[in-house]
């Protein structure tokens, strides 16, 4: 969020209340809108939302081929093109487009959760050693490089096979892949559509966190915070005091370069397709055009790199825990609960006006949220409960494990991705001192090892919305259900 959008808060007067958690701006709100825009949020969040969100989501509603509504989730805030938290589905058969601004530059930025059989009593005495060892094993910060050394030719296999490349090369357990969205591999990936510059930027970044809001966090299941015991058990969450590990990162410099490359291309070709947009940040091309397909195939390569990146990080986490606790990762039952993307476009079947359609669903700071009726797309153990959703909160307040519901059909099976910012990074740095924040967090039982103190200040808890209010809104809208709240005890910050 920048200062311009922060200053002007609150909804436009045309915003209509559909329910306590659904709000709508009609297609008549702005010239060019093809469908209404809907925001999933309670009144508290709506009143505090920056004006940029309402402007951007109504711009999205003007893109060719959009279906039903343009959506924004309760964690929504101003972004590039789409707001963060934006969801839109396009019908390729009706000229539906693909837009890098609806996916984000960090393609397949996503979340991963690893369970263990360790308890807080075992981990707390070693938390500093554990976090410091993880900091050494998983490089973080701008331009950091990973330990996996591969040739450009082998990197093509990473781009094609994603986390499945990791399985073939000793960085994954056989059970990991089934617990990743799309089994960790988007099949449409075509390395020939990725520029040399993008390849160069990704080549040495496997197994790295990067910077910004990316992190690796050790978390505790606290008594009273298990809301659905059956769903929790299916995910390997057995009771209070259990330790889990959360990872948040994406495709690093490679994804950014893919987005940059194709934004330029789309700005050049839009006149050829007669596309006019309300904001150049929404540059797009018809999905079925050669340029649209090229970007989709390149995006899939970056998404696969991100799946592989989180998998290599998981391998390193298992190694560090084995070293610190003197036990194998298998003995500690360090199983992958789930891995889910929240910056991506996916071809999915959805019902529009009673008719099944294959749509291109853009999720930008939004998570897929399949309910039990989409069982064929889920691991067998989750077919009765719905897809796990990993919702990252701030590093001071904690995170949530949720499940998707069939009610999420309302939003093209999409939900939020985190708490969402309320404050720009620049403002956070003005208001918070990183060293003081680090000390306060340690007093509150959270040991954090950060690359820079200014980067730590950017991610202070006060820079984010209250995750409880975000989750309340999701549940009230019927698109997500609480399973477990997780409390941070240690954090590696990029």
State the predicted function of each range.
Residues 120:
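Patatin-like phospholipase
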Residues 109-117:
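Acidic/polar active-site rim loop that often engages polyanionic ligands
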């Amino acid at each position: 969020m920048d200062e311009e959008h922060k200053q002007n808060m609150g909804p436009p007067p045309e915003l209509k209340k559909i329910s306590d958690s659904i709000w709508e701006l009609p297609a008549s709100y702005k010239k060019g809108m093809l469908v209404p825009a809907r925001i999933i949020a309670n009144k508290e969040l709506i009143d505090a939302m920056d004006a940029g969100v309402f402007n951007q989501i109504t711009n999205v509603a003007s893109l060719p081929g959009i279906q039903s509504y343009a959506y924004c989730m309760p964690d929504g805030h101003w972004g590039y093109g789409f707001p963060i938290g934006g969801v839109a589905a396009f019908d390729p058969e009706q000229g539906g487009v693909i837009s890098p601004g609806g996916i984000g530059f960090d393609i397949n930025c996503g979340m991963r959760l690893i369970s263990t059989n360790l308890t807080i009593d075992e981990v707390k005495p070693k938390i500093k050693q554990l976090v410091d060892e993880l900091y050494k094993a998983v490089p973080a910060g701008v331009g950091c490089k990973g330990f996996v050394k591969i040739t450009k030719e082998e990197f093509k296999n990473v781009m094609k096979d994603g986390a499945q490349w990791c399985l073939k090369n000793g960085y994954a357990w056989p059970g990991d892949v089934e617990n990743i969205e799309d089994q960790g591999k988007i099949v449409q990936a075509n390395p020939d559509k990725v520029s040399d510059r993008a390849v160069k930027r990704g080549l040495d970044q496997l197994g790295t966190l990067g910077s910004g809001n990316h992190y690796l966090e050790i978390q505790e299941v606290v008594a009273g915070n298990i809301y659905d015991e059956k769903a929790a058990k299916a995910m390997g969450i057995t009771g209070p005091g259990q330790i889990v590990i959360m990872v948040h990162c994406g495709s690093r410099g490679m994804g950014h370069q893919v987005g940059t490359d194709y934004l330029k291309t789309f700005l050049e070709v839009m006149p050829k397709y007669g596309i006019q947009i309300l904001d150049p940040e929404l540059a797009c091309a018809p999905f079925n055009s050669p340029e649209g397909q090229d970007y989709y195939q390149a995006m899939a390569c970056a998404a696969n790199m991100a799946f592989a990146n989180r998998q290599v990080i998981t391998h390193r986490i298992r190694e560090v825990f084995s070293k610190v606790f003197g036990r194998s990762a298998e003995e500690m039952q360090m199983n992958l609960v789930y891995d889910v993307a929240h910056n991506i476009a996916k071809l999915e079947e959805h019902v529009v006006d009673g008719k099944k359609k294959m749509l291109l669903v853009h999720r930008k700071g939004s998570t897929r949220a399949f309910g039990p009726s989409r069982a064929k797309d889920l691991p067998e153990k989750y077919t009765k409960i719905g897809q796990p959703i990993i919702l990252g909160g701030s590093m001071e307040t904690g995170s949530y494990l949720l499940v998707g519901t069939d009610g999420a059909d309302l939003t093209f099976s999409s939900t939020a991705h985190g708490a969402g910012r309320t404050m720009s990074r620049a403002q956070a740095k003005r208001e918070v001192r990183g060293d003081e924040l680090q000390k306060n967090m340690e007093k509150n039982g959270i040991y954090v090892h950060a690359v820079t103190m200014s980067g730590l200040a950017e991610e202070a808890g006060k820079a984010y919305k209250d995750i409880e209010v975000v989750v309340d809104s999701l549940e009230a809208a019927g698109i997500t259900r609480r399973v477990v709240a997780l409390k941070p005890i240690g954090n590696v910050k990029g």
